[in-house]
């Protein structure tokens, strides 16, 4: 049977069923079956007709009740579709109870996927919505189980603490706080309260001035405070007694002179008066003894010291008084002055042009006292040493002193470098052989232990010299027939270990690749070993 014939047969069967029972089905039921035709399974057969007939024979399809509409019959409650809108479930119980229970149990509320009241499909909890609520439970309690309140009889009423002491008469002023009757207040030195002076307000010109509350103690202490006193400067108590008088007298006399030059002989000790220059701000102290042997005189001065002075003003005199007051605070022994030579007082303006010793004191006072002979030479020597001197904690290469190395020490150093890992550093042990530095903080340990790269390079250079010496010593002993059986294997081992050492030498050298100077010096030491290896073969083949 073809496919078209099957579809025609199915359609005929459905039409027969609808024609026979047209009066028993409502319009909604007919529409369901018409739509159902479109979704029939391919395996549809005649058994469907029998199932429909059995369903129609059920009592729910009997004409027991009439519909509201004429010519229609009422469907059973399970097939009804409620037209009422669904009410969303809220937290308020009164709103949920207002919805009728039958409307919740109909098909449309149960099959609507958007509804929150789909309890059979949307939740696994058992919900009893179409049943009555459970009745309240009654609990019977015995009278013995109820505990009676404990009653404590009052034998005597509590005593009330009187706030006011009746023993104190009314006319007497109260000295003790009222709320502290049991523990009265006692005055002590720590709890001393200063009394205040209260003055009556003053009324002047329609203005009221209120008094200030000032404690007596503050007034008494204020009387003790001393007023600052200005102590005049005594010019007679200076180091140089004639200096201030000469300065004032000569400055007043020479107020209109432009410049003045004075020559002072260096052969004899003389008293040198001070001339102050306003622009140069320099002065030369007098009463200083000059030693000819210790002086380094400028050749342009011709053995004399020239001093310049400009027109003096009132500002010059004030500056002189300040200088003399500062000099009065210092105490200098004349015996120390005689052995020290001439001291020049240089202003802060000329400090940038001088390279003398002891300029730090000039920043505070504006002047610095400095020696002009020996201390200058010593300071220049110190500066030259500081320029050429390296860190004192790291000794120079020439400062390292190494002892003679044995053949065993040389072989040990060769094998350590032959087995050295990449990135590892070396250290000198007991000044005799090299070893790998395995310290936890290698940089700090090498710095504190003096295992710097300069020490390593110095030892490698010493290792080359000792290797060359031991090779020549062994060859000389072999040629002189001195313990030949032991010296030949010893020489062979020493030479073979040197070959392994040179093969792994660059691994040790690459650690210092960032330091170009150290890297180059290590390359020079390596070339020495290679040159010695070639000369050693030549010495074996062609004896000297």
Curated annotation (Swiss-Prot):
The organism's place on the tree of life at top rank: Viruses
Protein name: Uncharacterized protein R525
Organism: Acanthamoeba polyphaga mimivirus
């Amino acid at each position: 049977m073809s496919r078209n014939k099957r579809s025609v047969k199915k359609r005929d069967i459905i039409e027969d069923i609808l024609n026979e029972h047209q009066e028993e089905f409502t319009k909604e039921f007919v529409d369901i079956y018409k739509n159902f035709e479109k979704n029939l399974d391919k395996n549809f057969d005649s058994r469907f007709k029998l199932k429909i007939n059995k369903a129609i024979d059920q009592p729910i399809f009997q004409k027991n009740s009439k519909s509201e509409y004429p010519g229609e019959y009422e469907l059973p409650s399970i097939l009804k579709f409620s037209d009422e809108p669904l009410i969303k479930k809220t937290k308020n119980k009164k709103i949920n109870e207002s919805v009728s229970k039958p409307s919740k149990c109909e098909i449309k509320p149960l099959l609507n996927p958007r509804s929150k009241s789909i309890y059979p499909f949307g939740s696994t909890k058992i919900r009893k919505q179409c049943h009555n609520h459970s009745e309240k439970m009654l609990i019977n309690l015995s009278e013995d189980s109820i505990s009676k309140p404990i009653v404590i009889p009052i034998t005597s009423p509590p005593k009330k603490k009187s706030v006011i002491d009746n023993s104190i008469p009314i006319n007497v002023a109260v000295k003790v706080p009222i709320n502290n009757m049991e523990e009265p207040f006692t005055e002590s030195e720590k709890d001393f309260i200063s009394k205040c002076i209260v003055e009556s307000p003053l009324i002047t010109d329609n203005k009221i001035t209120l008094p200030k509350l000032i404690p007596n103690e503050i007034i008494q202490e204020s009387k003790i405070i001393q007023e600052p006193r200005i102590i005049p400067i005594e010019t007679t108590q200076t180091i140089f007694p004639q200096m201030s008088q000469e300065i004032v007298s000569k400055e007043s006399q020479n107020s209109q002179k432009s410049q003045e030059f004075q020559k002072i002989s260096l052969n004899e000790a003389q008293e040198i008066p001070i001339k102050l220059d306003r622009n140069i701000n320099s002065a030369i102290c007098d009463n200083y003894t000059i030693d000819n042997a210790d002086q380094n005189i400028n050749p342009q001065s011709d053995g004399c010291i020239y001093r310049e002075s400009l027109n003096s003003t009132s500002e010059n005199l004030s500056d002189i008084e300040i200088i003399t007051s500062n000099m009065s605070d210092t105490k200098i022994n004349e015996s120390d002055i005689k052995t020290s030579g001439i001291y020049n007082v240089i202003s802060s303006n000329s400090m940038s042009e001088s390279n003398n010793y002891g300029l730090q004191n000039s920043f505070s006072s504006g002047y610095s006292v400095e020696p002009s002979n020996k201390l200058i030479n010593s300071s220049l020597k110190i500066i030259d040493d500081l320029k050429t001197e390296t860190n004192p904690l790291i000794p120079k290469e020439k400062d390292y002193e190494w002892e003679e190395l044995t053949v065993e020490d040389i072989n040990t150093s060769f094998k350590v470098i032959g087995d050295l890992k990449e990135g590892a550093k070396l250290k000198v042990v007991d000044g005799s052989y090299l070893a790998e530095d395995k310290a936890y903080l290698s940089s700090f340990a090498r710095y504190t232990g003096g295992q710097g790269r300069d020490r390593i390079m110095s030892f490698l250079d010493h290792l080359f010299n000792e290797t060359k010496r031991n090779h020549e010593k062994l060859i000389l002993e072999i040629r002189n027939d001195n313990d030949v059986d032991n010296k030949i294997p010893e020489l062979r081992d020493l030479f073979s270990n040197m070959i392994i050492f040179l093969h792994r030498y660059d691994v040790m050298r690459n650690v210092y690749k960032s330091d170009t100077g150290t890297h180059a010096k290590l390359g020079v030491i390596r070339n020495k070993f290679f040159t010695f290896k070639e000369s050693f073969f030549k010495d074996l083949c062609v004896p000297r």
